């Protein structure tokens, strides 16, 4: 039995990844601060039975994260995988952004990700002692690779995620824990959708930002995460994989 914990599991990329891993036979513990979203998650995937568990967890709270992983540890002796997809988006120029928004971005996107990995690590290392290679996948962004106006603080958090990925990959390799990240471009998620265009038409402003002529769906990113969680990725460590339709390669400017 392969067991994965997924933060931000109730929506967006976390939801898509939960579905994908359940379909591939994983037992998934979905973590989110949205209790109604977790209830909806359980209802949507009730057919997977006891292979889906949920736990309320606010990654911005060290106490909440510790409690969630203590609960996981009491139920399971190990974790084979961790996907940190909980995230926050705030838009604004660096000279105008409120201190509260700046702090909130780092609290969730960087500190929350690190807290989750820190609390999960004993369970991930336990899988390594059983001869398995445990997996950690972080959600970075092409914003951490290529920056643009109005997203400086968000970009800084994602650049930090990339740095954490590479350092943790080296630190944890001896314990048979692989650490990688995916770096999506614009993805059609509830977090991103309000920032895309008037009227909620997610293709209105974004159809030209990718050489493929569309923005990503959560399933596009979940597929790459599933690969990194699979045995086929057993020699991939410290990688940051763009899932962007060629956006970074083409240097297509935002429209």
Model-inferred region functions:
Residues 83, 173, 178, 236-238:
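Short, small/polar-rich loop/turn modules that mediate ligand/substrate recognition or access, typified
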Residues 122, 170-174:
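Alpha-helical segment proximal to the catalytic Tyr-Lys
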Residues 117, 157, 165:
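Active-site helix of classical SDR
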Residues 93-94, 101-106, 206:
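Substrate-binding pocket helix/loop in short-chain dehydrogenase/reductase
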Residues 146, 226, 237-255:
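Short C-terminal tail/terminal secondary-structure segment
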Residues 141:
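Residue(s) in the substrate-gating loop at a strand-loop-helix junction
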Residues 95, 146-152, 174, 213, ...:
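Active-site loop immediately N-terminal to the catalytic Tyr-X3-Lys motif
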């Amino acid at each position: 039995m392969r067991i994965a914990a997924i933060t931000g599991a109730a929506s967006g990329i976390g939801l898509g990844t939960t579905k994908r891993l359940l379909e591939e036979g994983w037992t998934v513990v979905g973590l989110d601060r949205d209790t109604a979203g977790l209830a909806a998650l359980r209802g949507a995937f009730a057919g997977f039975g006891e292979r889906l568990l949920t736990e309320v967890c606010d990654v911005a709270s060290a106490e909440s994260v510790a409690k969630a992983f203590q609960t996981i540890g009491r139920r399971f002796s190990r974790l084979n995988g961790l996907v940190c997809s909980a995230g926050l988006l705030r838009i604004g120029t660096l000279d105008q952004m409120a201190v509260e928004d700046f702090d909130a971005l780092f609290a969730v996107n960087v500190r929350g990700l690190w807290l989750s990995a820190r609390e999960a690590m004993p369970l991930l290392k336990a899988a390594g002692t059983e001869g398995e290679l445990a997996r950690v996948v972080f959600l970075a962004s092409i914003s951490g690779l290529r920056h643009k106006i109005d997203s400086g603080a968000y970009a800084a958090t994602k650049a930090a995620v990339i740095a954490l990925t590479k350092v943790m990959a080296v630190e944890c390799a001896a314990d048979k824990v692989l650490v990688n990240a995916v770096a999506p471009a614009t993805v059609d998620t509830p977090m991103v959708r309000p920032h895309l265009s008037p009227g909620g038409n997610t293709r209105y402003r974004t159809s030209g930002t990718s050489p493929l002529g569309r923005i990503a769906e959560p399933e596009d990113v979940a597929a790459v995460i599933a690969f990194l969680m699979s045995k086929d990725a057993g020699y991939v460590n410290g990688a940051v994989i763009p899932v962007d339709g060629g956006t970074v390669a083409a240097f297509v400017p935002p429209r």
